[in-house]
């Protein structure tokens, strides 16, 4: 390998010139480009990598994260991969015709050069692109999310994965499938798309199109729902949302959004308290969430809802940990879809109750802790059911499906954390038969699985550590003794039985299974012992209808 030295000169009879005059041309141009560096640019490092790439005839050139404002005009002609992401580039030079993969994310590009004919992967998310050049037929994957693109060129038949989230697209491209076997997944979330072309139905049923958070007209939604509900439908799965796609980036100060939930005589003190939290992470989005929550069906129609929210906010003000958790949960729920906000409110109430249980609120009330655990178990099963339901739908807003099961079964399954009303149940695709089946499944699994689930539940472990320290310590000792003495042999036996001895991935999976079985055995024994003692004292029952 030839030595690398950014600062060496090329004498008239240098070794490089005797091999190829091309080296001298490249090196001279790169050295000149290096001398034009702006403050903060690492052009010396870039030139070092360029020369190394050329001398070694490498097919990869990585110039990412060097704070470069430009690239030299003459890149090594043999490269198939170019990574210039996370710089300050406003344009790219002519690209080598050999290039197959281009990574130029998180720059300031306003346009792209002509794309090489063999390009397979184009990753230019987080730039300032307003349009794209013609796309080569070889292109397989493309990420153009977080740009300013208003329209797309024709999509190559080979394109499998397209991410175009958060642009200014007003329409989808035409889709022509024919007998093409390619399974596609295209993301057009958070654009300005108001209608869907009929050509979308040309895609195969294994394909997925994501168009959430777009201002789709009610006519477009109804037409698509009618088409995709037909028994003869064989088109793609389409993910949408009832959000109109108009994201309101304006928000009022956190303290103002919070005090609006309180009676006037408390607002001054509340405002003073919450001013201290204005700069906490996700405070702005939490403020926006509170304003959106006030406009939900539950806020308008449910008696005592405002008082419930105010009481919850008081608890948040008293606990930095709970506030941090809640701000994070609410961070993605400020879209204008009302039911998304409602589902987030459900999750926030779950977060509160689980936090309270972990902090000791139910240490002396095992019956209440069991009831809470039972509700969390039921919600977990409903999420599994909703996830399975989503897979059966061709035109689906996942938020509406998840919320539908919680809302419509809130009374029958005694779900205290679930809102009792939702706005868009009609588009959820959840039927009365789905609800009956879900209720029966929850009750069946609860009867057979709840105690095992409860014995592994984190808040229950926190209670045991505080209130049954000796029993907990003994259980931990038994667990580690079993892991030390039996774990290796049990894993080996399992691998041998499946014919996977020596397989590292299988060993990790078998180890996790043995660990879970060990914990299940130890903690179930401890749980049965403690519950038998506590429930016999207060007359509570483990099984609950």
Swiss-Prot record:
The LRR (leucine-rich repeat) repeats are involved in substrate recognition with target proteins. The keyword Secreted applies. This is E3 ubiquitin-protein ligase ipaH9.8. LRR repeats lie at residues 57-77, 78-99, 100-117, 118-139, 140-157, 158-179, 182-203, 205-228. It holds the Pfam family LRR_TTSS. Residues 1-242 are annotated as: Interaction with target proteins. Belongs to the LRR-containing bacterial E3 ligase family. The gene is ipaH9.8. The active site is at residue 337. One of its GO terms (cellular component) is extracellular region. InterPro entries: LRR-bact_E3_ubiq_ligases, LRR_dom_sf, LRR_E3_ligase_N, NEL_dom. Residues 251-545 are annotated as: E3 ubiquitin-protein ligase catalytic domain. It catalyses: S-ubiquitinyl-[E2 ubiquitin-conjugating enzyme]-L-cysteine + [acceptor protein]-L-lysine = [E2 ubiquitin-conjugating enzyme]-L-cysteine + N(6)-ubiquitinyl-[acceptor protein]-L-lysine. The keyword ATP-binding does not apply. Exists in an autoinhibited state in the absence of substrate protein, due to interactions of the leucine-rich repeats with NEL domain. Is activated upon binding to a substrate protein. GO terms for biological process: protein K27-linked ubiquitination; protein K48-linked ubiquitination; symbiont-mediated suppression of host innate immune response. It is an enzyme of class 2 (transferase). Its main location: secreted. It comes from Shigella dysenteriae serotype 1 (strain Sd197). Residues 253-545 form the NEL domain. Residues 243-250 are annotated as: Linker. One of its GO terms (molecular function) is ubiquitin-protein transferase activity. Keywords: Host cytoplasm, Host nucleus, Leucine-rich repeat, Plasmid, Repeat, Secreted, Transferase, Ubl conjugation, Ubl conjugation pathway, Virulence. Ubiquitinated in the presence of host E1 ubiquitin-activating enzyme, E2 ubiquitin-conjugating enzyme and ubiquitin. It is found in: Secreted; Host cytoplasm; Host nucleus. Coiled coil: none annotated.
